[in-house]
Amino acid sequence: MAATLPLCAALRSPVSSRRFAPIHKTDVPFQFNVVLSPFFGSVAIGGRIFPRLPAAKQETDQDEVGFDQQPSQELAIASACLVGVLTGVSVVLFNNCVHLLRDFSWDGIPDRGASWLREAPIGSNWLRVILVPTIGGLVVSILNQLRESAGKSTGDSHSSLDRVKAVLRPFLKTVAACVTLGTGNSLGPEGPSVEIGASIAKGVNSLFNKSPQTGFSLLAAGSAAGISSGFNAAVAGCFFAVESVLWPSSSTDSSTSLPNTTSMVILSAVTASVVSEIGLGSEPAFKVPDYDFRSPGELPLYLLLGALCGLVSLALSRCTSSMTSAVDSLNKDAGIPKAVFPVMGGLSVGIIALVYPEVLYWGFQNVDILLEKRPFVKGLSADLLLQLVAVKIAATAWCRASGLVGGYYAPSLFIGGAAGMAYGKFIGLALAQNPDFNLSILEVASPQAYGLVGMAATLAGVCQVPLTAVLLLFELTQDYRIVLPLLGAVGMSSWITSGQSKRQETRETKETRKRKSQEAVQSLTSSDDESSTNNLCEVESSLCLDDSLNQSEELPKSIFVSEAMRTRFATVMMSTSLEEALTRMLIEKQSCALIVDPDNIFLGILTLSDIQEFSKARKEGNNRPKDIFVNDICSRSGGKCKVPWTVTPDMDLLAAQTIMNKHELSHVAVVSGSIDAPRIHPVGVLDRECITLTRRALATRMYLLNSLYL
């Protein structure tokens, strides 16, 4: 892109409006024929003649505008490997801390999951079962309050205190997740693992002061490392980063990440998986039971299981949404403090665990119990499995809504495993043992096979990661026979959940537009920058943030003026008529025009406000707009058109914003070369709307990536 700016500068006329947008890099090479005439000083393109700037000017533009250089591939790859190592070590420490806290909370109960609570007398354990999750919720509530306090900025984004707070926030969140899971609350560790990887990626990128593209690629690598180290499944981690991070961003911005992002993701995932295997052992997250697939005729049964898991996934999503709305309503309408809800969440889990102890988080050992992999542990009946599906959905949704910290992967696998096992037992009973069905020739697989497929189908439906779900189960089972049933069930589940999600999103969008139509019309006539941004949020909901996040948006030091400035702008000369100046502003949809001389030397800025003030002050004369010139307006305004403050493309956007705020400027010209040079050429315009949109888009993207809880 850096090389396209001098081309645009060379093709523009100094007395006409800019008509050339930067040529963005695409997969298909852009070719056109250009005829240069050194004698006549012009460029011929498609039969049109454009004045050509001097060669010295072009070289200066190339030197000054070529600031957006991508970092070396070697440094990016090394950074991705470093992210993988640090993420693997951090996830190992995180899991060890969860296990230590769990053993401390339950006095070192053997690794049998929560099945021991069904065998132990309830009278001797009921108080502990209730108090342990409740105390965990209380500690998480305190940590959440500390994290909110650490989230308040001092106003200087580069102060040492703010940097300490930036490190403290993810640390406190990780500790809160450790307490949540160690005390048995119904969430999972994979979401915090992704958060750990994303936080480490941000830290590494900040340490080396790299570009935003590198930072985004490292975030994808960190997310892959988090999943890889959590499940000891590197392939699934890579596809998770592709499905959850890279594909959503590629639909909106093709230049967000680096060309070698795929290599960075793979190396980071493999490195983290190796470190995790060294620290936690080579065994997978949960033990795969013995299973078999007996007949291709079972495929319709797996499709039906996928539809069932899709409905279960929708139930979990809707239940979480409803409980989150209820918590917000209780907080706003009833005045219940947010700090109370994590305690209520832990208390609710403890009460449910008195009857259904399997809802407690106990690693993946409860999943082993569902799949009947644990020796000397009696399997659960089909009706009890269905009850566990219902109570696990309620417990997980309430924990998530109450403010407890954790992810959705482990609960989704538990719910899917329970649903699949129950389905398999019902199918086996109906088709193999019931004499009412004359289908004895149909061989039905064991319930464990349906349990494994149900886990993947529910995971795909809840988290919208179908490829990750398929590859995760395939990587854990290492059996190609499971792929065909997996693909069918996962595809059916994803289709059901994605269709419902789109319809729900469409309904919410229509309701929002109907409710705010009057506000939108009013805001269209307003010149306030915040109104313009809100209009954009109404159209593009992916850029929306709540008010608390908007207040904390900060511009990182690595963002340059070139990434926010407008490269299309209107230019006028002192001899340009007022009518022509207004026409050029209208063509470019801007409220200002840059004043240049015949040599394209920047002189000042003409704004609509200047024209309006001139019109109000001019009381005599009947001159028409075409008889009034820019020189008349600038002379009458006492030299107001001459703006002494300019910025360069390679200047920090934060510094440019400081200049505009200090001198109360709504627009500032972006010029090539040094701002102190006597002859400077304009290359862009920076206004407050550009800064606001850039700040909000960056903050939204970072918020969505760094709050990625599955």
UniProtKB/Swiss-Prot annotation:
Membrane-related topology note: Multi-pass membrane protein
Record has Nucleotidyltransferase as a keyword: no
Compartments, as annotated in UniProt: Membrane
Biased composition (Polar residues): 520-534
Region (Disordered), start-end ranges: 500-534
GO cellular component: chloride channel complex
Catalytic reactions on record: 2 chloride(in) + H(+)(out) = 2 chloride(out) + H(+)(in)
Highest taxon of source: Eukaryota
BP-aspect Gene Ontology terms: chloride transmembrane transport; regulation of photosynthesis, light reaction; thylakoid membrane organization
Function per UniProt: Voltage-gated thylakoid chloride (Cl) channel/transporter involved in chloride homeostasis after transition from light to dark. Influences chloroplast ultrastructure and subsequent photosynthetic electron transport. During photosynthetic response on transition from dark to low light, involved in a sequential mechanism of adaptation; VCCN1 and CLCe first trigger the activation of photoprotection, which is later down-regulated by KEA3 to a low steady state, while adjusting electron transport. Regulates photosynthesis by a pH-independent mechanism likely involving Cl(-) homeostasis.
Record note on quaternary structure: Homodimer.
Stated name of the protein: Chloride channel protein CLC-e
Taxonomic source organism: Arabidopsis thaliana (Mouse-ear cress)
